[in-house]
Each structure stands twice: as structure tokens, then as C-alpha cells.
Amino acid sequence: MADARKLLGRMGEEAAARYLEKKGCRILSRNHCCRLGELDLVVSDGDVLVFVEVRARTGEEYGLAQESITGRKKSRLRLLAWQYLKEKGKTGSMCRFDVIAVLFDREGRVKRLEHFENAF
């Protein structure tokens, strides 16, 4: 079960990265890890650093993917972003937090991809 969830997560991140590249964003980091956790994607959108949380699902019976980001998760992502900015010497950079929700069909094809800019 955990392996299937990891695979779904990787598929979602790949779909999100392709989508963002088509929009003209530059991927700076995928799965950036530190002791506090992991950032799914870090991209540049012009002069803005964007921290992207990707949520992938195969159905909506448990709610929408973007609804699964709790207040605690948002706080953790802000901390991770601050750590990233400190590591890269970019603490003065403009940044935002986006969410990309990817819904896959049973064959693993993207059924719907939604991008929420400035999600929190």
C-alpha cells in the first residue's frame, strides 16, 4: 500500500512539473529534503520563488486533494520554505505557496490537474 501511494505521489509530482514547465516556470528542486521534512517542488516563476505542494488522488471519495492540506501541514511547509531560503541565501526573495491537485484515472492518466496559486 505504501509503495502504491509513493508511486502515485511521484506520478503527481511529475505531472505537476511538466505542467509548470509548460507555463514557463523553471524547476529548481524536486523533493528537497532537510531534517524538517520535504518540499515537493521548488520553482521560479519569473522573479518569484514558488513552493509547490502536490496532491495526487485516484478518486474523490475522501474529498478533494487540495482539501487534505491541514493548518499543521501549511505551518510545516512555511518552515521548510524558510529553511530552503536560508540554505540558498535567498531570504529576501519574493515567494508564494501553490498547491497542485492531480486526479488520475484507473489507467494512470491525468484526468484533471488544478493549480491553486497563492493557496496559503
UniProtKB/Swiss-Prot annotation:
Gene3D superfamilies: 3.40.1350.10
Source organism superkingdom: Bacteria
Cysteine disulfide partners in this protein: none
Gene Ontology molecular functions: nucleic acid binding
Cross-referenced Pfam families: UPF0102 (PF02021)
HAMAP family according to UniProt: UPF0102
Family listed: Belongs to the UPF0102 family.
Protein name: UPF0102 protein PTH_1707
Taxonomic source organism: Pelotomaculum thermopropionicum (strain DSM 13744 / JCM 10971 / SI)
